[in-house]
Regions:
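Charge-rich amphipathic alpha-helical interaction elements
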Residues: 1-142
Length: 142
C-alpha cells in the first residue's frame, strides 16, 4: 500500500456517520488496529531502508575518499583527489545514493502520516461523545 492509498483509506474510515454514532463508536478499536498494523509495517520498512541507505553511503564514502578496493575503481574509475570537505558534496549529489535517500524520506512521510492518523483515531471517541452531547443539548435533554 502506498501513501495515496493510505490517505484514501483514512478518508473513508475516519468519516463519522452522524446518524449511527453508537456504531461509529464501536468501530473505533478496529480502525485503530488496522492503522496500527500499517504503522508497524512501515516502521520496519523504514528501519530496513535506513540500513540500506547507510550501507550504501559508507560504500560511496569509501569510493570518493579512495579507500575502496581496487576492483571498484577498475569497474568505475574515479581519478579526482577530493578534499575531506568536498566529500559530503559528492555524496549529496550522487544519483545512486539519492535513490536510497528518496526511499527513506518517502517511508518516513508515510510513518508520519500514519502517526497523525492514529492520533485522529484516538480522538475519534471524543468527537463522537461531543456529537452525542450536542444532540442531547439541542433536543433539550440537558
Amino acid at each position: 500500500m502506498d501513501l495515496e492509498q493510505l490517505q484514501d483509506l483514512a478518508d473513508k474510515k475516519l468519516k463519522i456517520n452522524d446518524t449511527e454514532l453508537d456504531l461509529e463508536s464501536l468501530k473505533t478499536p478496529q480502525i485503530h488496529n488496522e492503522f496500527l498494523k500499517h504503522l508497524t509495517k512501515f516502521k520496519l520498512l523504514l528501519s530496513k531502508s535506513q540500513i540500506e541507505y547507510y550501507t550504501q553511503r559508507k560504500q560511496k564514502w569509501e569510493y570518493y575518499t579512495g579507500k575502496a578496493s581496487p576492483e571498484v575503481y577498475t569497474l568505475k574509475p574515479f581519478s579526482f583527489k577530493l578534499l575531506k570537505t568536498d566529500v559530503d558534496k559528492y555524496l549529496d549529489a550522487d544519483p545512486e545514493l539519492a535513490k536510497y535517500k528518496q526511499k527513506v524520506d518517502y517511508i518516513q512521510t508515510v510513518v508520519d502520516f500514519l502517526d497523525r492518523t492514529l492520533k485522529q483515531i484516538s480522538n475519534r471517541g471524543f468527537q463522537i461523545k461531543n456529537a452525542i452531547d450536542w444532540r442531547k443539548f439541542t433536543s433539550g435533554a440537558i
